[in-house]
Amino acid sequence: MAFSISKKAAVAALFSFLVVTCVAGARPGNFSASDFTADPNWEVARATWYGAPTGAGPDDDGGACGFKNTNQYPFSSMTSCGNEPIFKDGKGCGSCYQIRCVNHPACSGNPETVIITDMNYYPVSKYHFDLSGTAFGAMAKPGQNDQLRHAGIIDIQFKRVPCNFPGLKVTFHVEEGSNPVYFAVLVEYEDGDGDVVQVDLMEANSQSWTPMRESWGSIWRLDSNHRLTAPFSLRITNESGKQLVASQVIPANWAPMAVYRSFVQYSS
């Protein structure tokens, strides 16, 4: 996670903010769309980066959305924190954006696609992408990745795009600590919107759906007043209101920390 309440992280955050303030001093903090080439399909933002220069962001290759192994396919380290208008208190997790940098000589101007996997609270701009080092460097001209990363903070343009995870179906990772009266699951790899705004669970031999609640990030939980009876079907709803049902995707012999792949997927 990019934000921590530990003393060490607080000092790092203060240092990062001071650096951002100094770098941003070269141009107004409240810049307008007129600073960029007019393009109605793109919005303006600022970008920073964190973690290793060629890493996926967090040291544990995770983040505030709960995704695992973001250094591997399909994330492939092309990840980003989003501030609240992008992160949306966790409901923006998994959404995909095209980004391209401007106003720096090392910028290629070519769009790159990133996935929201983490959050940030730094007061940089209305829209702020705190990118992995890999994603930040990907916006550079060939051979100028490090030069662009050394800029620290840059102007970018961005737009929301459909997610597309070739060869993958919606996947459910049962979280550690789940038991017969507490069930928590990470939802990932949704094409289209990429995000999830609601998850519902149906027990075996039941005809009704029980709403789960967002635990944090893309992890949803159900605290039950009775022992849950598997197999479970899960129904997910994305930001557009489209629903998918993964029938009996969680088997009767489910286990914490196990991954269960469905046979369903949104159209991208």
UniProtKB/Swiss-Prot annotation:
Highest taxon listed in the record's lineage: Eukaryota
Pfam families the UniProt entry points to: DPBB_1, Expansin_C
InterPro entries listed in its UniProt record: Expan_Lol_pI, Expansin/allergen_DPBB_dom, Expansin_CBD, Expansin_CBD_sf, LolPI, RlpA-like_DPBB, RlpA-like_sf
SUPFAM superfamilies: Barwin-like endoglucanases (SSF50685), PHL pollen allergen (SSF49590)
Keyword line: Cell wall, Cell wall biogenesis/degradation, Disulfide bond, Glycoprotein, Membrane, Secreted, Signal
A single cellular component GO annotation: extracellular region
Any one of the GO BP annotations: sexual reproduction
Residues modified by glycosylation: N30, N238
Compartments where located: Secreted, Cell wall; Membrane
Transmembrane segments: none
Paired cysteines (S-S): C65-C93, C96-C163, C101-C107
PROSITE patterns named in the record: EXPANSIN_CBD (PS50843), EXPANSIN_EG45 (PS50842)
Job of this protein: May cause loosening and extension of plant cell walls by disrupting non-covalent bonding between cellulose microfibrils and matrix glucans. No enzymatic activity has been found. May be required for rapid internodal elongation in deepwater rice during submergence.
Record's protein name: Expansin-B3
Native source organism of the sequence: Oryza sativa subsp. japonica (Rice)
Encoding gene, per UniProt annotation: EXPB3
